[in-house]
Amino acid sequence: MSKERTRCREKVLEFLFQKDLGQEIEVDFSDFSPQGQVFAYKLYDGALYYKDLADEIISKFSKNWKLERIGTIEKNILRMAIAEMFTFSDIPQGVTVNEAVELAKKYVSPEAGRFINGILRNIVRNWDEVKKLKEGFVDVTSEN
């Protein structure tokens, strides 16, 4: 499942990137096993649900970097990793960080991998503070 999860993350990143660019997309994870589909849809939905909170967390824990200066791919990798840590408590945070770093190295550059690693490691080190931010999070996009 771990290789499939890596492929799921890549596909989720592709859809998040396209959505960020304002493209019309049809989210489809049918290429994956039933377990992979569940993982991919939950990760995609979580990244959208937690987007504003993730941006707040990224801003808080990315030293000397304004959110606007972070590239679109890197931002989506960070959002996805934060959503994964919130959504899948059974996946060790270190695995999530490593997967995010590998995505950054593959789709951006080795330097982007180090950048992503630094921010996510800072987030993991301050996880209690991050959980408090999550507790105060109100999803303004929900239609309740």
Swiss-Prot record:
Pfam families: NusB. The keyword Zinc-finger does not apply. GO terms for molecular function: RNA binding. One of its GO terms (biological process) is transcription antitermination. Keywords: RNA-binding, Transcription, Transcription antitermination, Transcription regulation. One of its GO terms (cellular component) is cytosol. SUPFAM superfamilies: NusB-like. Belongs to the NusB family. HAMAP family: NusB. Involved in transcription antitermination. Required for transcription of ribosomal RNA (rRNA) genes. Binds specifically to the boxA antiterminator sequence of the ribosomal RNA (rrn) operons. This is Transcription antitermination protein NusB. The gene is nusB.
